[in-house]
Amino acid sequence: MFLPFTAALALLFASGSALHDDPLTQPIPGNPDWMKPQSPLKLYGDTYFVGTGGISMVLIDTGDGLILIDAALPQTVAMTEASIRQLGFRVEDIRYILNTEAHYDHSGGLAALARESGAEVITSSIGAAALRAGRADAHDPQASSLPEQPPVPDARGIADGHVVRLGDTAVTAVFTPGHTPGSVSWTWKACEGEACVDVVFASSLNAVASGSFAYTAHPEVTAALRASIDRVEALPCDLLISAHPDNSGGDVKIAALQAGATPNPFLDRSACRAYAERARGRLQARLDREAS
């Protein structure tokens, strides 16, 4: 029998001084929802949600080790580890950590989790360069406001379409730049017996910028984001996890799944299309504001 999630967290934080002294888990200020505890849960087959209330993270049990997607913030690493252990898995069995984007709310915890697990961190080449530097790419629309984060010296860059294979699982990189220059979405199949579904962990597709950056002044970024939105919309998609759950109704689905809802609320073949349509609308609204 496993401890309730809140009890597991309490035990983990009992030695809080060590956490505060760790340079790789020093807090970076952010949206309070990003730090809100969220009990882990099975999404489908061997795919599990281990994120926070506002940031998605997924654990895949491949049968020959674990794959983790994204790492949230430095200060949420302890929560992530508690979630993984609450599900009955070992952090030390994580072989790969895949990243959607080099923004601190999705990659700030990478350095600590890679150290604790010994896992290899994988993302796009542009994203990997940003992770190794510990700062956002200079061409990122939010570069002027993003804080530095713990560098990931050994982050490995891969090409679009690269397949990460482990055990009986193959996870494919789908480059989706725009929100950041190096954004990556990830796809794989999850199975329950003979019933397999196409899973998409979609990167953020929001047209967000800071400082003097304007999408109207950077048509190449706008075009890249439009193409990424179209690409996510066209993916085989039975189950969607968006980088921030509330961007796709994932927060509502998590609550429903935890309450025992049937059928599984995450099984929705229209989810990627709806996510893309929302992102497309936000981009157009941004362009209209900038042009007015």
Q: Where do the model's predicted regions map?
A:
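Accessory terminal helices/loops
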Residues: 16-33, 193, 207-292
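Conserved beta-strand hairpin/beta-sheet module of binuclear metal-dependent hydrolase folds
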Residues: 33-87, 91, 186-207
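Active-site neighborhood of phospho(di)ester-bond hydrolases with catalytic His/Asp-centered motifs
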Residues: 69-71, 94-103, 122-124, 176-178, ...
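Active-site environment of divalent metal-dependent phosphoester hydrolases
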Residues: 76, 102-108, 128-131, 181-184, ...
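Metallo-beta-lactamase
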Residues: 20-29, 36-38, 42-44, 93, ...
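Sec-dependent signal peptide recognition
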Residues: 1-8
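Active-site HxH/HxHxD metal-binding segment of metal-dependent hydrolases
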Residues: 75-78, 85-163, 191, 267-268
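Loop/turn elements at helix/coil->beta-strand transitions in domains of secreted/extracellular proteins
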Residues: 65, 92-95, 117-120, 169-171, ...
